[in-house]
Amino acid sequence: MLSPKRTKFRKQQRGRMRGVATRGNKIAFGQFALQAQDCGWVTSRQIEASRRAMTRYVKRGGQIWIRIFPDKPVTMRPAETRMGSGKGNPEFWVAVVKPGRILFEMGGDEITETIAKEAMRLAQYKLPVKTKFISLDEDLNKGNYKPAKTPVTADDSESSS
C-alpha cells in the first residue's frame, strides 16, 4: 500500500476541497487516462485495488502510471471513547482529489482504446469519485496542449536576416 516514508507532522487537519485541479489535469505519460469528475478522498487501499484490477485485465500488455499519491493522514479515535483527550491516531492515508485530476494513465504498443476503456472501467468501480475515460487524442483536440516551440538554431537566425 502507498504511504509516505516520513512526514514533517504526524497529523493533519481535514481541510476543504474547493475548486478544480490546476495541476495534474493533463495526460503526461500514456495515451489513455482516468480523470476525476468529483472531489473526494481516495485511500491507499482503493488506489491499490484499482491498480490490481487494471493490471489483471491488461496482463503484460502495457504500462500503467498512478498519478495520485496518498500523502494525507486520516486520524480516528477508538470506538466507544469519550469526547476530548486529544486527537486520534493516524489510521490510513488518502489522496485529495479535485475535479479534473488525472488518477491513472495507461499506454503501450499493445494497448488499444477498447482494452484501455475496459481496464479503466474495472478501476472505476473501486473508486469513491465519479470518473471519466479520456484519451490523448481528445485532449489534443480540446486545445489543452500547445506544441513545443522548436528551438532556433544558428542557421535559422542567419537565413532570416
UniProtKB/Swiss-Prot annotation:
Annotated keywords: Ribonucleoprotein, Ribosomal protein, RNA-binding, rRNA-binding, tRNA-binding
Pfam families: Ribosomal_L16 (PF00252)
Record bears the keyword Membrane: no
Gene Ontology cellular component list: ribonucleoprotein complex; ribosome
CDD domains, per the entry: Ribosomal_L16_L10e
GO MF annotation: an example: tRNA binding
Record flagged with keyword Ribonucleoprotein: yes
NCBIfam families: rplP_bact (TIGR01164)
Protein's UniProt name: Large ribosomal subunit protein uL16
